[in-house]
Amino acid sequence: MQLTGSEILVECLKEQGVDTVFGYPGGAILNIYDALYKHSGEIKHILTSHEQGAAHAADGYARATGKVGVCMATSGPGATNLVTDIATAYMDSVPMVAITANVTLPLLGKDSFQEVDIAGVTMPITKHGYIVKNVEILADTIRKAFHIARSGRPGPVLIDITKDVTAATCEYTPVTIQPEERVTRYTREELMLVAEMIHKAKKPYIYLGGGAIISGASAEVAEFAELIDAPVCDTLMGKGAFDGRSERYTGMIGMHGTKTSNLGVSECDLLVALGARFSDRVTGNPKKFAENARIIQLDVDAAEINKNIRVDASLVGDLKKTLTELNACLSKQEHPEWMAHIMELKEKYPLKYDDENLSCPYIMQEIDRVTNGEAIITTDVGQHQMWAAQYYHYTKPRTFLSSGGLGTMGYGLGACIGAQIGQPDKVCINIAGDGCFRMNMNELATASRYNIPIIQVVINNQVLGMVRQWQTLFYGKRYSQTVLKDKVDFCKVAEGLGCTAIRVTKKEEVAPAIEKAIALKAPVLIECMIPEDDKVFPMVPAGAPISEVFDGDDLKRQS
């Protein structure tokens, strides 16, 4: 059948199972929006307050559902406003397709109104980018883009379409999309070598990253941990891949990881990295990282092997399939002395905070209790992000959504909106500091417009908390441009944008506020006032070995 480029785009989105698109219209993309209007019963479009909010929402939708998130923007500034979250998605391996429109083909390269080479701009931060100048290749390009976005190590793909292509016509033939194949690239000999190394270990440790969530390998990870009788630590991106209430779980590793995880990994004789990339935030000084251990790395991306840390063995392939095959090769191991030592570390070094005043750790524990650990938590970036990772028990994958690699302030609210749309039966809560919240708080208008029942918790300490913490510890308390004590009333802002607002100043007010917000089934902002000097501990100084992890008690003893 003969269809316009815009109609072909919509039909291809339907082929891919797309049910929601996040975006913002403009001149160059009008034809596409006209086609979406005609199919509004099949594809829901969420109009955000800003294109960056659309990209963050598509990102959150993808992380919460495992599907490809889709965002759209017009040419020029519309397209460039997507860039920050395209980079966010790239760093965190999120499957996303960003669709932009550009000026007509005769105007390309002439500095035309709202013309930007968005494919060139995003080349370093996408898995692939396309410029479509011929309607005949549009359908095939869209199908390739979705395949690339979700296959292997997922990531964002950009499709830039000139406006004349969206109006031109050609023959469209529908196709049936086949599921992605789970691929492995190791030999039987390599698999057996890894199994042998595991069998010889006396003090094994499992280091879990986001790849375990992407591949859907939680059940296989749990079986692996039981088989080799090992403790499990995770990264920010790996939260929820392993049951956070399990006795084997020791918390995060790295800069704000637990003492147990950091000291335990420093003592282990075998470290097995599952879908983890040895980020600098995890390893600290790479020359001193797990220096007593042999290291095995399982990852879908061959480029990650030996990139940051030299390993002794590796298996490249889809983690779920790899672990299924590896588990079948293993006999049950028992390490009672090692596990007893880890339990002693857990008992000796529990996470601690000052519970005299209202604090973010207390707030997170109350949210955990009220929601029974079953909410989807999104965060922005900073102290609150670490507290949200430390003090909420994540028991299932795709329940902690955060910008890990890029560290994008302003990410959480849009991501929470996307997650709520993708998982409408879940309670979705965004945790943001007052600094982060300012960056994209206009997306409360989006939540209000569609009555998306997200809960926005603002941890208000009136400072840029994480930067201030570094200024306190390492910069002689010179608080350069980190004080935010101004006249912004976040509750009034929320109410002005059509949301319910609650201010919390006492510990006993936290649980009732969360319970009320959940019961309202409408967008709610909860502003929580906490002291400006609260700090995130434990902590590893940048570049130091993770064995040098310290907490507030250590600082008091030194002073």
PLM segments and residue spans:
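N-terminal alpha/beta PP-like core and its mobile active-site loop of ThDP/TPP-dependent enzymes
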Residues: 1-330, 366, 370-373, 453-456, ...
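Active-site diphosphate/adenylate-binding microenvironment
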Residues: 6-10, 14, 18-19, 32-37, ...
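Glycine-rich phosphate/pyrophosphate-binding beta-alpha loops
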Residues: 27-29, 76, 93, 156, ...
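A short acidic, glycine-rich active-site loop
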Residues: 46, 180-184, 403-406, 476-485, ...
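Thiamine diphosphate
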Residues: 114, 449-542
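Phosphate/pyrophosphate-binding active-site segments
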Residues: 174, 292-383, 507-508, 516, ...
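Hydrophobic, well-ordered secondary-structure elements that form the walls
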Residues: 295, 367, 379, 418, ...
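Catalytic phosphate/nucleotide-handling subdomain of diverse soluble enzymes
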Residues: 411, 415-453, 459
